[in-house]
């Protein structure tokens, strides 16, 4: 019998000027970017938390503390690679990931395939094992007021042992 684990993740960051907007490792043209200690890639952060949560390994703040200068401006895809290594070392592999990005603007549909390609390359899975959807918050809440962008992710891990 195959063992599986499921984890979920969430992240939100504030939109500010003079920062790049990076989602799923893709630089998205926009006048605002996300504020954070690293590159503030909320999608990748939510996926990392989902992977860690599936194995009861805590959250990304435990491994990459926001007050630690070594993570300042860090490329979240490199952090994801480290989390993926933890998953593999424990005898698990990614079955699939499903995620949602909540942003009023910019329109993200043109960038979803590139995000899927970047994430699947890091996680060593086929692109069709990574689901990414984008939606608005219908002008409600911080995302709807364009104060921030958030992402939700669910990860299914399959035992390779």
From Swiss-Prot:
Cofactor binding note: Binds 1 divalent metal cation per subunit.
* Cofactor(s) required, per the database record: a divalent metal cation
Q: Does the keyword Metal-binding apply?
A: yes
Give GO BP annotations, semicolon-separated: isopentenyl diphosphate biosynthetic process, methylerythritol 4-phosphate pathway; terpenoid biosynthetic process
Swiss-Prot/TrEMBL site (Transition state stabilizer) positions: 37, 136
**Can you tell which superkingdom this protein's organism belongs to?**
Bacteria
**Any keyword Lyase?**
yes
Q: Name one GO molecular function term.
A: 2-C-methyl-D-erythritol 2,4-cyclodiphosphate synthase activity
Tell me which InterPro entries the record gives: MECDP_synthase, MECDP_synthase_CS, MECDP_synthase_sf
Residues bound to a divalent metal cation:
11, 13, 45
Which amino acids does the record list as binding 4-CDP-2-C-methyl-D-erythritol 2-phosphate?
11-13, 37-38, 59-61, 135-138, 145
Assembly and interaction partners = Homotrimer.
What family is it from?
Belongs to the IspF family.
UniProt name for this protein: 2-C-methyl-D-erythritol 2,4-cyclodiphosphate synthase
